[in-house]
């Protein structure tokens, strides 16, 4: 698979190891005839040691086939997150390093996740596009302060902070985009 076709969360073989791509930066060519380059921030699977590497857009990488199992968040065991396979009731434990920044989107009862397995061992987690989280702290709305929309910070039940419109109040449940971390609307 070409480097330009890789996405966040892809698992690849590189330097005799297996890595998950966590971040991708694209650099544009300077002047004529320059090649587009991609810089990947990758973490070893399993293990979680960080590696940064750059590739030309048409450079080939070997994608690793994963088994994906739909699961829901069950409970937190110390620093580890435990997910329950909704089909055969298998428990999958992923450490905080494997979860990474996604930990801020995981709350009680979260379903629609996919645990990614290599050789029956859980190595990564794919979250749904949007999750529902409760606002636990946000400043009150300023009445008549301005005619323009101003976002305000809101602390969510998992501890992360997102910018929300002024009309959102403490105790409301909101949709949060797990890719961008942005407010996605009120939860129904």
Swiss-Prot record:
One Pfam assignment: EFP
Domain of life: Bacteria
GO BP, sorted A to Z: peptide biosynthetic process
SMART domains: EFP, Elong-fact-P_C
Cellular-component GO terms for this entry: cytoplasm
GO MF term set: translation elongation factor activity
Family designation: Belongs to the elongation factor P family.
Protein's recorded name: Elongation factor P-like protein
